[in-house]
Amino acid sequence: EYQVRDLPQALIWANEEAARKLLGQSPVPAYTNDIRMVMTPDLAVWKKIYQHQLDSYEDSPDLQTLSAHYKGLSENHLLQIIGHELAHWSDLFLDDFADYDANIWFEEGMVEYISRQYFLTEEEFAQERFCNQLLVDLFQEKHGWHSLDTFGKSTYEGDYASIFYEYWRSFLTIDQLVEKVGSVQALFETYHKWAQSDQSISLLNWFVQEELLEKEI
């Protein structure tokens, strides 16, 4: 359905330290490149990482809601993370692993959306969307707004709140677009329509110009 024809040559289960430092230099212990996929399959580790998004915010009812949500994550979320990484291998994306700064928000948002739809229950999907919006609002209230087009390799130089902020905005943007065009397949078709244009404006601005998005999140 999503044209995932090729798969990583290796799927490596690793503890948090190995996944983050020894194998990929990544602050998030799940990633894919053109050879392998690496992931820490420990739910407790992921609960801890997601909780770290909240470290710089003062206690509030919203923060308590978010903390309770992440403490209660099910093993479906581990499957969703695996699905997220495998969905990167879809041939429907136009860029390869070397082009990480080229409209990467779209690919990251799509693989997050697809994997959540596939592995999470309807209730879990809705709760993730709700919590993502809370986190985006908290981040923007504290740090201000910037365009999603800045999502790129430099994103990973920040703390967990700033890293996941870009992922959650990407997901929420894709969620709006899918609702507008009707399906994931229709959104891929729209994406390919932009690719066949002169690409004089970014994909994100093109969605706004085509009135598929009212404005950036």
Residue ranges: model-predicted function:
Residues 142-217:
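Pan-zinc metallopeptidase signature
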Residues 80-93, 112, 116:
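Active-site recognition of the HExxH zinc-binding catalytic motif
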Residues 3-14, 102, 128-129, 187-190:
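Surface-exposed patches in mature extracellular/periplasmic domains of secreted proteins
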Residues 70, 88-100:
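A long, hydrophobic alpha-helical segment
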Residues 1-60, 67-77:
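Auxiliary, metal-adjacent structural segments of Zn-dependent hydrolase domains
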Residues 79-86, 138-149:
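A structural motif
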Residues 75, 79, 83, 103, ...:
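Hydrophobic (often cysteine-bearing) scaffold residues that line and stabilize catalytic clefts
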Residues 101-140:
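Post-HExxH zinc-binding segment in Zn-dependent metallohydrolases
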